[in-house]
Structure formats: structure tokens, C-alpha cells
Amino acid sequence: MNSIVSRYYLSVLSPTLNFEAGDVGKLPVAAINKNEKEIIINIAKRAIEISEEDWIEFETSYKFSGIRLTRQSFNSLFNAWKDWADLCQLRRNELITIEADIDRRLISAYSLESKLSAEVMQAQVQIAEGSRELDCQRLISYAIGCMMGRYS
């Protein structure tokens, strides 16, 4: 449902911004061989893992156990933040690669090579980026939460 192929078909079936339950039911289902289906399922599971790992890093997650900047020992806050920013970039790059791979496979399965591109833009990936300003806000929020007893 989150592939470029489903977005393409949904835009054809319902060119407005909203979709009815019947629109989703009208989506065509391609005959994908078992091996290809397993590959798509496995890489989709990895994409879900990456997104969950990212989500757990935020205070609004029910699995949140602390901010990464304070969980590892570094000789400076900058080095801790740099490690976090590098991890965010690795996750982002892996997710972009996975999403492009899934799109490429589905475009091929539906024979839409002439209509769609599997290129995934950075802005399309909803995952944390290493942002000094936002990460400072998160660190302060976490510190205040600790002082107020939120994490004890």
C-alpha cells in the first residue's frame, strides 16, 4: 500500500485526496512469483524494523528508554551528537534503498516501467535526521523530564 505503484493506481481510481474503501478493493493484484514475493516481504520487514528503531528514539514512543545522546559514553556532547547524526543518515540511506528496491520490483511486476520511476527522494522518507537544533530541544526536554521524575 505504501509503494509508488499503489499510489499510481489510487490516483487513477480516485483523483481526489480521499479514498473510499471500495477504491482500495479495486486495486489490481499482480501475479508475483513466490521467490520475488518472499524478497519483497523480507525487505519490507527490514524497512519496518528501521522505522521502529527510529520511533523508539523519541519520548512519545511507549518503548522510549532514554535519549541516545546520554546512553553512550563519549568524551563530548558533540561526539555523541555526531554519532547520532551518522546513525540517522545510515538509517535514512538504508530506508531509501529499500523503498526504491520495493518500488522497482513492483513497477516491474505491474509492467509500469514506462509510467513510473523507482527514485525515492530524501524528503519522502519520514525518519529522524541529525538536526542540532531539534536534538538540543529533545535533550533539554529529556533532561527536564528526568528532573521532574518522568523516567524514574
Regions found by a protein language model. Name each.
Residues 28-152:
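Non-catalytic DNA-recognition/assembly elements of restriction-modification systems
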